[in-house]
C-alpha cells in the first residue's frame, strides 16, 4: 500500500518487481490485500474524521482525478479528490483525502455536518451546503488569482492585478512573522499590524468598482474578493 499510494507504483509494476525476485504475486492478490488493509484502517479513518471536525478551523479544496475502468463512468470523465486539513494551530493535525465521483456539495456537507468552526475554501458554492460552518475565503486562492491576472512583466506600478498580489504578499509575510506566538499575542499583532493592511486592501478593491480601465480578470477578482470578504 505504501508503494502504491506514497511511491506511486501501480500494482502491475509491483507484481513485476516481486517476479524478478522469484516470488509469484498476482495483481489480484495484491489488490485483495489493499482492500483488506483499507478495512483494517477504517477505525483509524473514523477517528481522523472526528479529530478533524472537533477543531476550530478546517481548510478544504478539491481537485480533478481520473479513475480508469470506474463502474458507470467513461475513462475520460472527471472525478474528484476532496482534501481537508486542520488549521495550522490545531492541537491534532489531520490531513484527510476523500475520493468522490463528482463535485457535489453534498460530500463536504456529509463529512462536516457537525463542524461548527471556520471553513476556509475557495469561492465554490458547494461548500455553502456545510450546515453549521462559517465560510471564510482562502487568501492563497485570492493571491493566485491576482498573480494569474498580471500581464507578463508587470509591476505594482503598472498593473492593478500586481497591486492586489502585493497586498496578499504583505498579509502572508505578516502571518509568517506571527508564527510561534501565543494565540492572544497573535490576535493583538493582527489587530495592530494586519488590520491596517486589510483596511487599505478593501479600500483599494472598492476603488476598482469605479475603474473602467480594469480588465475582465481584474474585475472578476474584484468580485471574488468582495464576495469572500
Regions found by a protein language model. Give the residues of each.
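Catalytic center-proximal scaffold of phosphoryl-transfer enzymes
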Residues: 1-229
Amino acid at each position: 500500500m505504501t508503494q502504491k499510494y506514497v511511491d506511486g507504483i501501480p500494482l502491475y509494476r509491483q507484481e513485476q518487481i516481486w517476479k524478478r525476485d522469484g516470488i509469484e504475486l498476482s495483481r489480484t492478490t495484491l489488490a485483495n490485500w489493499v482492500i483488506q488493509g483499507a478495512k483494517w484502517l477504517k477505525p483509524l479513518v473514523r477517528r481522523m474524521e472526528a479529530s478533524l471536525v472537533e477543531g476550530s478551523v478546517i481548510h478544504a479544496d478539491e481537485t480533478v482525478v481520473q479513475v480508469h475502468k470506474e463502474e458507470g463512468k467513461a475513462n475520460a470523465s472527471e472525478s474528484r479528490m476532496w482534501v481537508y486539513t486542520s488549521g495550522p494551530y490545531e492541537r491534532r493535525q489531520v490531513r484527510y483525502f476523500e475520493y468522490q465521483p463528482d463535485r457535489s456539495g453534498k460530500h463536504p456537507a456529509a463529512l462536516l455536518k457537525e463542524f461548527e468552526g471556520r471553513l476556509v475554501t475557495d469561492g465554490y458554492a458547494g461548500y455553502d451546503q456545510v450546515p453549521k460552518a462559517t465560510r471564510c475565503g482562502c487568501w492563497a486562492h485570492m493571491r493566485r488569482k491576482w498573480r494569474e491576472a498580471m500581464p507578463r512583466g508587470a509591476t505594482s506600478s503598472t498593473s492593478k492585478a500586481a497591486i492586489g498580489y502585493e497586498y496578499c504578499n504583505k498579509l502572508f509575510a505578516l502571518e509568517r512573522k506571527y508564527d510561534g506566538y501565543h494565540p492572544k499575542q497573535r490576535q493583538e499583532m493582527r489587530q495592530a499590524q494586519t488590520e491596517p493592511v486589510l483596511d487599505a486592501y478593501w479600500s483599494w478593491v472598492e476603488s476598482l468598482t469605479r475603474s473602467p480601465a480594469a480588465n475582465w480578470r481584474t474585475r472578476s477578482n474584484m468580485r471574488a474578493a468582495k464576495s469572500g470578504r
